[in-house]
Swiss-Prot record:
Chief place of localization: endoplasmic reticulum
Name used for this protein in its record: Ubiquitin carboxyl-terminal hydrolase 19
Pfam families, per the entry: CS, UCH, USP19_linker, zf-MYND
Species annotation: Rattus norvegicus
Induction: By streptozotocin and fasting in skeletal muscle.
Record's keyword terms, sorted: Endoplasmic reticulum, Hydrolase, Membrane, Metal-binding, Phosphoprotein, Protease, Repeat, Thiol protease, Transmembrane, Transmembrane helix, Ubl conjugation pathway, Zinc, Zinc-finger
Manganese as UniProt keyword: no
Entry EC number(s): 3.4.19.12
USP domain ranges (all copies): 536-1253
Example of a GO cellular component annotation carried by this entry: endoplasmic reticulum membrane
Subunit structure: Interacts with RNF123. Interacts with BIRC2/c-IAP1, BIRC3/c-IAP2 and XIAP/BIRC4. Interacts with HIF1A (via N-terminus).
Gene this chain is encoded by: Usp19
Catalytic activity: Thiol-dependent hydrolysis of ester, thioester, amide, peptide and isopeptide bonds formed by the C-terminal Gly of ubiquitin (a 76-residue protein attached to proteins as an intracellular targeting signal)
């Protein structure tokens, strides 16, 4: 450049003066570098390389170029090799001074280049092609000019020497005399210098070939010829002005301070092209403001032919700013808006310069607050801030404008895609990570890796086609301006070290992100990973295990992971949705997901995501415990609102069936739901169920279809094991004892009947369940009756009955009870006066109804009758039973066979030998037998007392209303009158009664004769005296003895029952001894482990409970449109449409009331493979069954007061849910370990994640979403700006997370009630307060759950 500047541009001075100035600056530079402690660059003798010292060989593939340099025979230290890459060229400098570089044939991806060492003294350069599948005919472009060649800068391509690269002479830029002062100033405000300073050197345009230059000292002043022999000129007419905009300017370079020898200056120099020799200066070309209302012109006035010494003493300099307060957001898919907050900026001297990869803001300001931040600067100081952009822009379409408080810059994207941030991320140079500073780099330099992010093949192809017609305008737009900035020879100020975020690591290739396999493998080899991808844990921030388990489970949802990994979600962010977070939640979740799958952290801290969630849901503020399912529902709902494709939600109404087909109503309801809710979350997680309501009064049926995000399936309540004794229809089969598990609450008899039905292979309609108390039927259960009051100690009998459909006629069902004819209970004292029996002559008289008490006389009996009246009833023996006989075959013989067959299992009967002289009672009246009542004989009662005639106190019973449901013996309303003769006067007056006589020798045959279709002859049945009598008890509780009518069927109604009375009276001939015994039965082998399985359920049982009809509670009453009133209707939920990812919540937590809260820890057995839901889904009849495979489980340990969450998950393959790309792992906060699949099913499972087989989620094309992104309003712009800042902050903080192990294990103090040990905003006082409050809450809950129920129960007793 010239030594002076004018109002229109820089001008050249006399050749002699400039040469002297150049030598003076060289001397000053050497002195300064010696003071800075870098004598190597000054004192090391220069070694002139020859062309044979570097041997070049190169090869190419479809997506990259590999260059090999033979630099010697010894080992190479990669840290001493200086390498600089741009998209078009490169420079490699060796420690001994040799260098190689040039302009490539085509563009490369400078951000992905690598420098590696190989055996044999080889240096290998890996250069990814920017346009894959493009074949390079040569490595380097053929130079256009024929300038002097730099010794040693010669290359060979495939063994053949290439033409040398053209160079240009240059000269050392001058330094200002205030260098020391500027260096001190730079410590407070960043880098200071001009276009030729070490921190801001001229660089090539992204479209211009670069030529290396290096000349001897004193050679190449600015008066020397240019590349085409033209001297610089000052342009006067408009035609030459346009040409001047197309020219490139090259400042002279010194060999010791040029790009080739500086580690900080990694950019290449641009080629200067001048137009006309008519003038010795060149006018700068500026980019005008695109705003027609605010068209600012930057004017520079510099004296023509000014003294160079005066320039050196210039008081002001251009200050390169490292940071300016700003924010940015993406306005739609095509533009980015940047707000730079600088007040009182001077419009006449401020402007913005745009290039396709960056922009530079040059301004002056009068703001005192801003100037105080930069000591030594004033209103005339020129500030410069440059931003390297993340992707390419259209410089011609970018605009800017000035306001009183800020500068607004609008960038037009070249490609319509989301950037995810403003500045370009970090990159690598020479195989090592290099962080690109967030501060500016010079406009005329291109730092390595500062180019746009690598594009996919399709995007790159579109970018190449779009770049071709604009090559001329882009090449000539800014490059001429870069070299003509004022004060470019001012002394540079060193830039302080800036703490920059580390670059993000490359993630494994996603299905929707075609990345080169070779480059990915090389990146994985170079990357220093601390764990395998997918084995990164999450730090427990303090009781945040509920959040960690949910995030880890969702991160293993294959479709969701890929959707956020390849950044497809960016095109669907809805900034206008007031129900969302403006994209902040989606971006935060995406960054967290990427960190979990990079493998660069042992544990990651999800504090940013928690803060975003807490800003939207205040219940998650702080570090209290929460429900994992509640957090999961909020997170998925928040992601849905952030990604909702609907910008303006229309009003919709609930769709009712009104008699229409379910298929039509369901589809209409789903489409209406999609009119307001359409996102990737809906496509992946949401299903649809059918809700059916039935009014109990008018039978109005209402059917609606509603969406669901997860299925909250209830668990059966705590189980109880009930012993059930099953009696087959025929008595020859021994009873079988079954153990059946039912719920302690809300259980019904139908559960038992269905369970037994599956065991005995009998229809539930043919079974009857009855409860037995004190050897009599207490009640017979209908299928709908509740079993809540039944305890495991109660006796339950189940009987198989003959169905009328099978018999094809009326079937008579009879209840049968057993009792002895005469009880054998000794009596020692009077029940009324408590006087003991004195002698045999004064025996106590028994009560003839119950035979359980005795009296001295009738007076004592009448006195005691009020107390004895309620207890006066006979007691049965054995077990009662039910018999079912067809009406046409109900003969006395058949009935006797059935009764004796059933009775022998519960009573012991023994007939003693016949004793001559025993009194026969056949001649007595029937009243002696029909009115006798006995008490039950205790099993094992050896003390027996002979019954004398005087002890038989008989009375005539008077019927009384039966107060019991199954009362077999009515109490008398008046007391019996004792008689010393043993026979009352009423019986004597009654005379002979019918039915008393019995046939001699009558005996019942064996029960085996009761087989259907087999009938014994009457002679065989009547061969012996019967052991019992049969009495019929009618509805009025009156008894009548049945008579044997031969083959004539007995006439018995359905409202009567039977009593089997054993002949145990010792005064009768052939009496029997009878006593109760334990029921003879066989044990069911399948019930052996029922007690152990009492706390085990299956997922099918839970789904059955979910789909079972239930009656609404009064507070949930449904408004019937037909009755016009709220009704406690019957509600039933049925699955209609199943999602691709099914989430099932096991409702382990029971909230019956504020006091009664409980957690069910019983095991729920759920399938890991092949969950078939075809029997639960009534809609969408498809060819393939809805089969699901488990891929994640959230576990909860502990109870209601405190607990801990963990997760088990695997990453299913993208093609088949049965296979896994990453196997099962256990996520316990920051600890991640592998587990076997058999260890996944535990009693602590809380939330289950299933993936459907053979049902991929189709993503809509990105172009289809263009209509969902109209121009954003002010509120949406603010949300987009904040979301963009969060994306940058999260990416920056992603690499600064502590990698050590997290908190304590699963039972550590952080997972229980208490404050976090290291909360970011929690002080020691706050921790103590949280601990005290948590302890008090735990004590209150303990009192309410334990002591209050005890007090309340004792009160009601």
């Amino acid at each position: 450049m010239s030594a002076g500047t004018s109002a229109t541009g820089p001008r050249r001075g006399p050749p002699g003066l400039e040469e002297a100035t150049s030598k003076k600056k060289q001397k000053d530079r050497a002195n300064q570098e010696s003071k800075d402690g870098d004598p190597r660059r000054v004192s090391m003798p220069r070694k002139e390389p020859t062309k044979d010292e570097l041997l070049l060989d190169w090869r190419q593939s479809s997506d990259k170029v590999v260059v090999k340099l033979r630099v010697g025979t010894g080992p190479i230290c990669l840290e001493e090799v200086d390498a600089a890459f741009t998209d078009t060229d490169c420079v490699v400098r060796l420690p001994d001074g040799r260098q190689w570089g040039g302009v490539f044939f085509a563009k490369i991806q400078s951000s992905c280049t690598k420098v590696q060492t190989r055996k044999g003294g080889l240096l290998q350069l890996a250069l990814p092609k920017k346009v894959p599948l493009l074949t390079w005919p040569s490595l380097l472009k053929k130079p256009l000019g024929t300038q002097e060649l730099v010794p040693g800068l010669r290359c060979q391509e495939n063994g053949q020497e290439l033409s040398p690269i053209a160079l240009e002479p240059g000269s050392e830029p001058r330094r200002a005399k205030q260098e020391a002062r500027n260096q001190k100033r730079a410590q407070g405000r960043g880098e200071v210098g001009s276009g030729a300073s070490p921190g801001a050197q001229a660089g090539p345009s992204a479209k211009r070939a670069v030529h290396l230059c290096r000349g001897p000292e004193g050679e190449g002043s600015m008066d020397g010829p240019g590349p085409q022999g033209d001297a610089p000129s000052f342009l006067s007419d408009s035609a030459t002005q346009v040409e001047a905009e197309e020219q490139l300017h090259v400042p002279p370079v010194n060999p010791q301070t040029s790009l080739l020898g500086s580690e900080k200056n990694l950019a290449l120099l641009t080629v200067e092209k001048t137009v006309s020799p008519r003038s010795d200066s060149v006018s700068p070309v500026m980019i005008r403001n695109r705003d027609p209302e605010k068209d600012d012109h930057f004017k520079e006035e510099m004296a023509v032919g000014a003294d160079p010494a005066a320039l050196a003493d210039e008081p002001e300099s251009m200050v390169n700013l490292a940071f300016v307060k700003n924010d940015s957001y993406e306005k739609g898919p095509d533009s980015v808006v940047v707000h730079v907050y600088v007040k009182e900026s001077r419009r006449d001297t401020s402007r913005v310069l745009f290039r396709e990869q960056d922009f530079t803001l040059i301004f002056q300001t009068r703001d005192g607050n801003f100037l105080r931040l930069h000591p030594g600067c004033g209103p005339h100081t020129i500030f410069r801030w440059q931003v390297k952009l993340r992707n390419l822009i259209e410089p011609e379409q970018c605009t800017f404008c000035f306001t009183a408080s800020r500068i607004d810059i609008c960038l037009r994207k070249r490609q319509s895609q989301r950037w995810g941030g403003l500045e370009a991320p970090a990159t690598r140079v020479g195989g090592a990570k290099v962080a690109v500073p967030t501060g500016p780099t010079p406009l005329d330099s291109t730092p390595p890796g500062g180019g746009p992010l690598p594009l996919t093949g399709q995007e790159e192809a579109r970018a190449v086609e779009k770049e071709k017609p604009k090559a001329r305008s882009e090449d000539s737009g800014l490059d001429g301006v870069v070299a003509r900035t004022p004060l470019e020879h001012v002394t540079p100020k060193p830039e302080p070290h800036l703490a920059s975020p580390k670059p993000t690591c490359m993630v494994p290739p996603m299905p929707h992100s075609p990345v080169s396999g070779d480059s990915v493998e090389e990146d994985e080899e170079e990357e220093k990973k601390v764990c395998l991808p997918g084995f990164t844990g999450l730090v427990n921030l303090g009781n945040t295990c509920f959040m960690n388990s949910v995030i880890q489970s969702l991160s293993n949802t294959r479709e969701l992971r890929d959707f956020f990994h390849d950044r497809s979600f960016e095109a669907e962010i809805n900034y206008n949705n007031p129900l969302g977070t403006g994209g902040r939640l989606a971006i935060g979740f995406a960054v967290l997901l990427r960190a979990l799958w990079k493998g660069t952290h042992q544990a990651f801290q999800p504090s940013k995501l928690k803060a975003i969630v807490a800003s939207k849901a205040s219940q998650f503020t702080g570090y209290a415990q929460h429900d994992a399912q509640e957090f999961m529902a909020f997170l998925l709902d928040g992601l849905h609102e952030d990604l909702n494709r609907i910008q303006n939600k229309p009003y919709t109404e609930t769709v009712d069936s009104d008699g229409r087909p379910d298929e039509v109503v369901a589809e209409e309801a789903w489409q209406r739901h999609k009119m307001r809710n359409d996102s990737f979350i809906v496509d992946l997680f949401q299903g649809q169920y059918k809700s059916k309501l039935v009014c109990p009064v008018c039978a109005k049926v209402s059917i609606t279809f509603d969406p669901f995000l997860y299925l909250p399936v209830p668990l059966p309540q705590k189980q109880k094991v009930l012993p059930i004794y099953y009696f087959a229809r025929e008595p020859h089969s021994k009873p079988i004892k079954f153990l059946v598990s039912v719920s302690k609450e809300n259980s019904s008899a139908s559960e038992v009947l269905e369970s037994l039905s599956q065991s005995v292979h009998v229809k539930p309609e043919s079974l009857r369940l009855a409860e037995v108390i004190k050897n009599r039927f207490h009640r017979v259960f209908l299928p709908s009756h509740s079993l809540d009051a039944v305890s495991p100690t109660d006796v339950l009998l189940c009987f198989e009955l003959l169905s009328p459909e099978l018999a094809k006629e009326r079937v008579v069902v009879l209840e049968v009870q057993q009792r002895p004819q005469v009880p054998s209970i000794p009596i020692s004292k009077c029940a009324a006066c408590q006087r003991k029996q004195q002698s045999e002559d004064e025996k106590l008289k028994r009560c003839t109804r119950c035979y359980r008490v005795g009296y001295c006389n009738q007076f004592c009996q009448k006195t005691h009758w009020p107390d004895h009246k309620g207890l006066c009833r006979p007691e049965n023996i054995g077990y009662p039973f039910l018999v079912s006989v067809p009406a046409s075959r109900l003969t006395y013989a058949r009935l006797a066979q059935l009764l004796e067959g059933y009775a022998r299992y519960s009573v012991s009967v023994f007939q003693p030998p016949f004793q001559p002289g025993r009194m026969a009672l056949e001649s007595q009246s029937p009243g002696c037998t029909t009115l006798l009542s006995t008490s039950s004989l205790e099993a094992g009662d050896s003390e027996r007392e002979p019954i004398q005639p005087s002890e038989l106190q008989l009375v005539t019973p008077v019927a009384e209303g039966d107060t019991g449901a199954h009362r077999m013996w009515p109490p008398a309303d008046r007391g019996p009158v004792p008689s010393t003769s043993g026979i009352s006067s009423e019986m004597l007056a009654s005379g002979p009664m019918e039915g008393c006589s019995l046939l001699a020798g009558e005996r019942v045959s064996r029960p085996e004769a009761a087989v259907p279709g087999y009938q014994h002859s009457r002679e065989s049945v009547s061969a012996h005296t019967p052991q019992f009598f049969i009495y019929k008890i009618d509805a009025s509780s009156r008894e009548q003895r049945l008579e044997d009518k031969g083959d004539t069927p007995l006439e018995l109604g359905d409202d009567c029952s039977l009593a089997l009375v054993w002949r145990n009276n010792e005064r009768l001939q052939e009496f029997v001894l009878v006593a109760s015994k334990e029921l003879e039965c066989a044990e069911d082998p399948g019930s052996a482990g029922e007690a152990a399985r009492a706390g085990h359920f299956t997922l099918d049982q839970c789904l059955n409970l979910f789909t079972r009809p239930e009656v609404l509670a009064p507070e949930e009453a449904w408004y019937c449109p037909q009755c016009k009133q709220h009704r406690e209707a019957s509600k039933q939920l049925l699955l209609w449409r199943l999602p691709n990812v099914l989430i099932v919540q096991l409702k382990r937590f029971s909230f019956r009331s504020f006091i009664w809260r409980d957690k069910i820890n019983d095991l729920v057995e759920f399938p890991v493979r092949n969950l078939d839901l075809s029997k639960f889904c009534i809609g969408q009849k498809e060819e393939q069954l809805p089969s699901y495979d488990l891929y994640a489980v959230i576990n909860h340990y502990g109870g209601m007061i405190g607990g801990h969450y963990t997760a088990c998950a695997r990453l299913p393959s993208d093609r088949s849910s049965q296979r896994s790309d990453v196997g099962w792992r256990l996520f316990d906060d920051s600890t991640v370990t592998t587990v076997d699949e058999s260890q996944v099913v535990t009693r602590y499972a809380y939330v289950l994640f299933y993936r459907r087989r053979n049902s991929p989620v189709e993503r809509p094309p990105r172009a289809a979403h263009a209509e969902h992104h109209p121009d954003l309003g002010p509120a949406a712009e603010a949300a987009a700006s904040q979301a963009s800042r969060i994306w940058q902050e999260l990416e920056a903080e992603e690499e600064m997370v502590p990698e050590g192990p997290g908190p304590l294990g699963p039972w550590g103090p952080q997972d229980w009630v208490g404050p976090p040990p290291r909360g970011p905003t929690t002080s020691d006082e706050g921790c103590l307060r949280y601990f005290v409050l948590g302890t008090v809450a735990a004590l209150v809950a303990l009192v309410l759950n334990v002591f209050y129920p005890l007090v309340s129960q004792s009160r009601w007793r």
